[in-house]
Amino acid sequence: LSEMICEYADDPEMIAYAKSKGAKGITVSGVCCTSNEVAMRRGIPMAGNFLQQENVVLTGACEAIVVDVQCIFPALGPLSKCFHTKFITTSPIAQMPDSEFIRFNAATAAENAKAIVKMAIDNFENRKPELVHIPQMKQKATVGYSVEALVKVLDGVANTQVDEMGTTKPLIVCITSGVIRGAVAMVGCNNPKIRPDYAHIE
């Protein structure tokens, strides 16, 4: 669904429709794990992590927040009602109070995404400029470890005189020779009970 939303947010027809409603264009931002996916594959900016999802609504600049089946704070519904934000759920097993439900289905993904993007555009006119506050804090990040990302990193450390460039061969050689004895994935959402990213950095 996120991929299709990105497609329609970039569609010239939808952009023209947004401009006809007074917007400068369409901005899609991601939160949590889906954010990592669309940031890695499409360069879509991240608005925050799991713990920051409510802050996205608090900016007053979010026309719609769309969720699927996990990592959803129950307060998003009531919070969205305090602003103009449309809170949209897309999974029948994760419908929530104070949300609008658009059932996502792979067979109708394009239709679902177009409806969601149009709903967000139509909601732009309800934005209250006096409530909009977008923090100017920005942070660089490396997101996603696709094969392409790994190859790029490996090319940066490989010896161009002897190593084959543009492949995962340097990593494979390090693993098979025992230089690298394993890999660890540090994954999971932050927990409101502990300091953010505590499990990852300490």
Model regions and ranges:
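Metallocofactor- and cofactor-centric catalytic cores in central/energy metabolism, strongly enriched
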Residues: L1-E202
